[in-house]
């Protein structure tokens, strides 16, 4: 007696069909239109999907589409110094994944490494300034006292460095800043105190113009200071203050109850983050260790006016929107600069 042939069941351990990395089947122009509507915080994650995604996310056409659709946004960049040079990172969203209870309390932000072909040139904190989608490195020599006239630009769209027109003269003790929406460089052309010079970059003409009548007192703000909506803020020994121009004195920034205490010797940097204050610092381990964390807090600012004995009194309150660990690095890494570009 013959039995009908049974279909052989696939073994539970049989090798599954090979699958390739998903390749986008949509035309590039459609993908660009979609990417232009996605927050740039997700771009580092999207760039890992495929090589074509990575190419589209770095294309000039994408940022033209973002500009035309009104989807430009601010992007926070962080520069760190290590033994082999300088490394750049950008604020991004963590990929969606199954999270533990502790991870659910996280802000969801992290610092993603910015791949820069050829690496980064030598930079200093005072030599860097962000204008639009570019970060300018003005006379960024390693030795602060050495003179230089070189200028290079980091294009935050393609993440590539390019050379820019040099300053007309070499400057030492250089400091870069933004004044009236224009990038500038200022410093001393020689050892004399009266040799302080200020230059502003004319992007249309591609040249540096010498500005007369501006003294050194108008500049030289360290990274523990920042200006937000024409108000100066500072931090020293963990105390945040703002300058009241009406009474000409510094006042304490109130609130900030959720802000943790900084470790002794921490480098704290402030930045204008779209009208809010971004605070980044390196948190050293409580016990001697080989790693430390780069932490960040974003603070919303609110001006409040009250009257005390018929006298007007202004105060500014800060509300911590989120605070989190963004990156773990060796203790030998130094926090150099925090910049905010518009893309």
Swiss-Prot record:
Domain named F-box: residues: 20-66
Key words of the record: Kelch repeat, Repeat
Region feature (Disordered): 1-25
UniProt feature, compositional bias: Basic residues: 1-15
Kelch repeats: 134-181, 183-224, 225-271
Keyword Electron transport recorded: no
SMART domains: FBOX
CDD domains according to UniProt: F-box_AtAFR-like (cd22152)
Disulfide bond annotation, renumbered to this chain: none
Keyword Repeat carried by entry: yes
Domain of life the protein comes from: Eukaryota
Protein name according to UniProt: F-box/kelch-repeat protein At3g08810
């Amino acid at each position: 007696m013959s039995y009908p042939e049974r279909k052989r069941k696939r073994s539970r351990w049989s090798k599954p069909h090979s699958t390739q990395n998903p390749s986008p089947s949509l035309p590039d122009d459609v993908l660009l239109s979609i990417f232009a509507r996605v927050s740039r915080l997700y771009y580092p994650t999207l760039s890992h999907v495929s090589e074509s995604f990575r190419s589209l996310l770095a294309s000039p056409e994408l940022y033209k589409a973002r500009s035309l659709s009104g989807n430009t946004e601010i992007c926070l960049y962080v520069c760190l110094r290590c033994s082999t040079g300088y490394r750049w990172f950008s604020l991004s969203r963590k990929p969606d994944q199954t999270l533990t209870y502790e991870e659910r309390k996280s802000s969801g932000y992290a610092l993603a490494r910015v791949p820069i072909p050829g690496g980064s040139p030598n930079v200093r904190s005072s030599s860097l300034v962000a204008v639009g989608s570019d970060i300018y490195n003005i006379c960024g020599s390693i030795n602060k006292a050495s003179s230089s006239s070189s200028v290079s630009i980091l294009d935050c769209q393609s993440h590539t460095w390019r050379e820019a027109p040099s300053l007309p003269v070499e400057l030492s003790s250089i400091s870069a800043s933004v004044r009236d929406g224009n990038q500038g460089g200022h410093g001393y052309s020689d050892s004399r105190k009266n040799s302080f010079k200020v230059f502003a970059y004319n992007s249309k003409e591609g040249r540096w113009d010498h500005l007369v009548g501006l003294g050194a007192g108008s500049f030289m703000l360290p990274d523990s200071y920042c200006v937000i909506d024409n108000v100066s803020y500072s931090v020293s020994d963990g105390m945040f203050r703002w300058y009241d121009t009406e009474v000409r004195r510094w006042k304490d920034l109130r609130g900030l109850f959720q802000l943790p205490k900084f470790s002794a010797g921490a480098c704290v940097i402030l930045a204008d983050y779209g009208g809010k204050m971004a605070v980044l610092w390196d948190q050293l381990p409580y016990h001697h260790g080989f790693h430390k964390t780069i932490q960040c807090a974003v603070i919303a600012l609110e001006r409040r006016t009250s009257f005390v004995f018929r006298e007007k009194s202004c105060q500014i309150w800060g509300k911590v929107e989120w605070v989190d660990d963004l990156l773990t690095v060796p203790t030998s890494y130094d926090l150099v600069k925090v910049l905010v570009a518009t893309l």
